[in-house]
Amino acid sequence: MDILVIFHSNYSATFFRNTFKDHLLSFGRHADAEVYYFNTFIKESNYLKRQSFDLIIYHYSFMAQKWSCNGALLKHNWLKSIKGRRVAIAQDEYFNSNEVNEFLKYHDVKVLFSCCDRLQDIKLIYPKHLNNLEKVISVLPGYIETKNLKPLNRLKKHVNRKVDIFYRARNNSMVLGKLSLGKSRIAKEFLFLELPHLTLDISLDPDDTILGEQWFLSLENARVVLGVEGGASVFDPDGSLSSRVDEYMKNNPEASYSELNENVLKESEGSLDYKTISPRSFEAIMTNTCQVLHEGSYSSVLTPNKHYIQLNKDFSNIKNVLLLIENQEYCEKIATNAYRDIIGNNAHTYEKFVDIVISNGLKSRREFRHNNSRFWLKCQSKFHLYVFAQIIKIIRKYIY
């Protein structure tokens, strides 16, 4: 079986995030197939136009070109020349779905893997008359990469961890609605508290971003990590709402969310209930780090007060939560519950995800041919050389 994964990356810092790399490379690692990758950032391939595959997967990084709102996603018409059954993986589906649907229809994408888990949201974002989809399958935005797993007995005991509360996030644009504000609010609330007896490593500063292996080391050095559900509560199908928000904030830079909501978002707020468990939750579980999370459903993966300490969104139970955080034995018990239950059942691994994509993407599991042409050897060689060049470029930028 031959699979082509089409992605888009300029090898910025995002490329070095574990969540991105593990998702992208999961097909090459876990599919029982010959898997080839093509980065549309480089250039189009005349040779590739003449090839055929059993399955063509448009990765979410490719679909993310919708964020430019300049039709970038629609400028890859040449990809339609490649023969094969097409599927797509989508994320951040609350934004510019019109362009996505136009792409899906033109390229005759048959199956979409979506982070939506509510039928009414799927119908809103992907109305049938705008695409040729046969089905939409709900998946998570990230999974557990087993190659990154350490056995529980090899992870740091909580007594040896130097940081009590750890968190990294950014100030999300208010255009995503009230739901998305939780990421920054939870950080600000904890930073506002006077906790001299606890060691905090909490930041919303982009300069404090942690990538790669260092991210897992930071998690393993912390007893507790904060978190919220990912998603948005506002639907912006063509990007026009985002433009209105930008214009309003340009003229009113100190405006609060309440003011923005009253003047711009009011009719759109609550139009969508797009929320999902964050890949960060799985990373915390993998390092046996106790999570303090806002109340939520977390894609029905986690159980409150068994797999995480629940913090009310209005922070009304913050005093009790702080008492639990100070209880080192309790935090380690919660973390271990999550590790044994979530890691132990193997239901949320990238192996399972890849199987979901392939089994739902293909019409049948028949025997397939293999493509061993010299083109792919040449293509892979050029790909790795290009990645290496970009890494050197980034290193030089930070050193010099």
Where are these regions (language model features)?
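C-terminal amphipathic helix plus adjacent low-complexity
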Residues: 153, 255, 317-400
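Acidic (Asp/Glu)-rich catalytic clusters
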Residues: 77-81
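Hydrophobic, well-ordered secondary-structure elements that form the walls
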Residues: 284, 308, 338
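Nucleotide-sugar donor-binding catalytic core of glycosyltransferases
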Residues: 1-51, 60-75, 88, 93-99, ...
